[in-house]
Amino acid sequence: MASFDAAERRNLDRHICMRCNARNSPDADRCRKCGYTNLRPKAKERRAA
């Protein structure tokens, strides 16, 4: 993880739209670009390749 907590929180505390992959605010109810309501939290750890 990053050594700067504020920067890490700013980058990782997001919701991702399952339809268009747009980044949304953490308190969003629907996507800012396409209006889709199925949002997931951004992954905090990288996936293994």
From Swiss-Prot:
Family annotation (SUPFAM superfamilies): Zn-binding ribosomal proteins
GO biological process: translation
Single Gene Ontology MF annotation: structural constituent of ribosome
Keyword Membrane on entry: no
InterPro entries associated with the record: Ribosomal_eL40_arc, Ribosomal_eL40_dom, Ribosomal_eL40_sf, Ribosomal_zn-bd
Superkingdom as given in the UniProt entry: Archaea
GO cellular component terms, A-Z: ribonucleoprotein complex; ribosome
Transmembrane annotation, as ranges: none
Annotated family: Belongs to the eukaryotic ribosomal protein eL40 family.
Cross-referenced NCBIfam families: PRK04136.1 (NF003161)
Name of the protein described by the UniProt record: Large ribosomal subunit protein eL40
Organism: Halorubrum lacusprofundi (strain ATCC 49239 / DSM 5036 / JCM 8891 / ACAM 34)
Gene name for this UniProt entry: rpl40e
